[in-house]
C-alpha cells in the first residue's frame, strides 16, 4: 500500500535520536514519538474466529456490516492481484453506511490517505465523528490527530488534547500514548512529566510499542519517574520486539554502552542493523563505530541475527484498521 505522512501508523514527531559528540552517549533530551492517524495494533489478531471465505463473502454481499468490514481489511492488506484499495473502499463504505463504527473509522483512514479515492479530510472527519457519536474509542483518538496535525481542520492543541483524553479514558492505547505526549511537551495543557509517564505506562502495559518506547525514554532520562537504566532497557526491549525501529536503535546504544545491561557490541550491532534493514538509518554513526571494533566473523554473525530479527518481526499495522 502506498503511504504518506499519515499512513505509516507512526509519525516521528521530531528526530528520535540526538547523539552526543562522537556518538558515545544517548542524549538526555531525546524526544518522543506520537501515534499518527491510525492506532498501532497487531493485524488480524483478534478474538474473532476465522471463517470460510465463501461464507464471509456471501454474508457481506447480503448486507452484514461486520463481514463487509472484514472483506475491506482483507482487500487492502492482500498481496498480489487480490490487493485492491478501491474494493476495500467499497466494502468499508457499505459497512459504514450501515452504522458500523469500525468501518466508519476505516473509511476515514482511506479518505485521509487518499487510498482508493482522492484524499478528502472533510469526509474523514465526517466518518470519524459518526463513529465517535457511537462511543468508539479509536475515533476519539483519530479526531485528536486531525486537530493536532491540522488536517482538514484548524490546528488546535487544546481540542486535540480533549479528544485524546476522551480516547485515553475509554481505554485506547494510542490515545493514551498521545495524551502522555501532550503532557510531556505541554501541548494543549500544562507540561507535567509525571502525568505523561503515567499515561505512557497505561499504554505500555496495554502493549502499545510507542507507549513502551516513550516510557523507556522517561526512565532513561529520569523525567516523571526515577532515572532507571534497567527499566529503560526493559521497555526498549519490549518495543523493539514489536518491530519499533527507534527502540531498536536505542537498545543498540544501551548494549554498546552497557547501560541497563551487560556491554555487548555484537548485540548492539545486530539491533541497529535490524533497524536499518527496516529503513531507519538513525543509528548509522554508532554502526560505523562498531564495525571497526568487530571482526569480520562477528559482523557476519550480527548481520545474520539482524536478518533473523527482521524476518521474525510481528506484523504491525501500517494503517490500524479497526475490526
Describe the role of every protein-language-model region.
Residues 41, 70-77, 81, 106-113, ...:
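Hydrophobic face of amphipathic alpha-helices that form TPR/SEL1-like repeat modules
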Residues 74, 95, 110, 131, ...:
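TPR/TPR-like alpha-solenoid repeats
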Residues 61-64, 77-79, 84, 97-100, ...:
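Short helix-capping/linker turns of helical repeat alpha-solenoids
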Residues 9-19:
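Bacterial N-terminal signal peptides
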Residues 69, 105, 126, 141, ...:
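TPR/TPR-like alpha-solenoid signature
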Residues 45-54, 82-91, 118-130, 154-166, ...:
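Structural signature of tandem alpha-helical TPR/SEL1-like repeats
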Residues 21-76, 317-323:
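N-terminal leader/linker segments that initiate helical-solenoid repeat arrays
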Residues 281-323:
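Terminal, low-structured helical/coil segments at or just beyond the last alpha-helical repeat
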Amino acid at each position: 500500500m502506498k503511504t504518506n505522512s499519515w499512513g505509516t501508523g507512526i509519525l516521528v514527531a521530531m528526530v528520535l535520536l540526538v547523539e552526543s559528540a562522537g556518538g558515545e552517549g544517548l542524549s538526555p533530551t531525546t524526544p518522543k514519538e506520537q501515534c499518527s492517524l491510525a492506532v498501532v495494533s497487531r493485524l488480524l489478531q483478534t478474538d474473532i474466529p476465522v471463517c470460510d471465505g465463501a461464507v464471509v463473502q456471501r454474508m457481506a454481499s447480503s448486507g452484514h456490516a461486520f463481514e463487509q468490514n472484514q472483506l475491506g481489511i482483507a482487500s487492502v492488506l492482500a498481496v498480489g492481484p487480490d490487493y485492491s484499495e478501491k474494493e476495500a473502499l467499497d466494502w468499508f463504505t457499505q459497512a459504514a453506511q450501515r452504522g458500523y463504527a469500525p468501518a466508519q473509522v476505516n473509511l476515514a483512514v482511506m479518505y485521509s490517505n487518499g487510498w482508493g479515492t482522492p484524499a478528502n479530510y472533510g469526509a474523514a472527519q465526517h466518518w470519524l465523528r459518526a463513529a465517535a457519536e457511537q462511543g468508539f474509542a479509536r475515533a476519539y483518538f483519530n479526531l485528536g490527530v486531525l486537530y493536532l496535525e491540522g488536517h482538514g481542520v484548524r490546528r488546535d492543541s487544546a481540542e486535540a488534547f480533549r479528544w485524546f483524553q476522551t480516547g485515553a479514558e475509554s481505554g485506547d492505547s494510542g490515545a493514551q500514548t498521545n495524551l502522555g505526549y501532550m503532557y510531556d511537551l505541554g501541548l494543549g495543557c500544562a507540561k507535567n512529566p509525571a502525568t505523561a509517564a503515567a499515561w505512557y505506562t497505561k499504554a505500555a502495559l496495554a502493549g502499545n510499542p510507542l507507549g513502551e518506547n516513550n516510557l523507556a525514554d522517561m526512565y532513561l532520562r529520569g523525567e516523571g519517574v526515577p532515572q532507571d537504566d534497567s527499566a529503560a532497557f526493559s521497555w526498549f526491549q519490549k518495543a523493539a520486539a514489536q518491530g519499533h525501529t527507534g527502540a531498536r536503535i536505542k537498545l543498540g546504544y544501551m548494549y554498546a554502552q552497557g547501560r541497563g545491561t551487560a556491554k555487548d557490541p555484537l548485540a548492539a550491532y545486530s539491533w541497529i542493523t535490524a533497524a536499518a534493514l527496516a529503513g531507519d538509518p538513525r543509528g548509522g554513526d554508532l554502526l560505523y563505530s562498531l564495525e571497526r571494533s568487530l571482526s569480520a566473523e562477528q559482523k557476519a554473525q550480527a548481520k545474520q541475527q539482524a536478518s533473523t530479527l527482521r524476518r521474525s518481526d510481528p506484523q504491525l499495522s501500517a494503517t490500524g484498521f479497526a475490526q
